[in-house]
Amino acid sequence: MTIETMNDETEKSSSTEAIVLALVAILVAVFMVKFGLQTLTWVEGKTWAAQSPWLNTVPQPLPAPPAVAAGPQLKAFDFEINAPWPGTPKPNPSETNVAFRYDTGQTLVFFDPGAQVDTLRSIQNGNPAEFQKFTNIFAGKPIDSNYALYRDVYGAAPSQISPIMNGSDAMRMNVLLLWKLSFGFDLRTDTGFYSFDWPNIHGFQFGDPAKGVPVALRAFDDRGHQFRFILTTSPDSTTKITQDDINKLLLTIQPVPFIDR
């Protein structure tokens, strides 16, 4: 093979490599234009999940329980519920909650609904530019209540992000995950994390009572009220909290009639 032939082959090889590299660069550029946001969101999600593995936890739905019969009630902050346990508890009020303590060892902490943060209203009444961004990001799937906000936030997980997903969905997921990091959980979710969407009451349960752990509840009624409860037992108590106890409480939350206030 002559030197001229070798040079010609080298030039052809170099030209082919240059064309291939150019095509790759074009494909990468097209991908980044079309999927750059999604890819960045996907990478961020993986990074956040590695640092905070609980981000991958989403609530498991609880089935709707049967109706609850009328029974003894507990009252606090102009609301009432059916007492989850028999007996006459000793109320221990504080500025933000009332703790009902039973002689059998159970305690129900009822937090003041009026002291709960109205997150959605804070967003709506905040910086107009930020609210406009919020409206634009969630235009396809509007959030119209605090329950809907928590439902979407707690239901988001990095595993739901894909580099080839819709761009607006990627932006929405990015915001939801940032909020999830900010909101955190009321109790550790490795003991159970559940959601309920029943007539008149909706929300989340942190903890499985069958595991003998405290249970926290964050609930929302159809009138915009927010409720938080903690159910626990003293270390020396042999009495257990059951899911029926929790259901009884949730299904009977209602305002105290004005005549009884």
PLM regions and their residue ranges:
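N-terminal targeting sequences that direct proteins away from the cytosol to non-cytosolic compartments
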Residues: 2-123, 223, 230-261
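Detector for Asparagine
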Residues: 7, 56, 82, 92, ...
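Alpha-helical structural elements
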Residues: 37, 43, 49, 105, ...
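Glycine-centered secondary-structure boundary/capping sites
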Residues: 78, 105, 125-128, 180, ...
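Solvent-exposed, non-transmembrane segments of extracytoplasmic/periplasmic domains
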Residues: 90-166
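Signature of long, low-cysteine stretches enriched in small and polar/charged residues
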Residues: 136-223
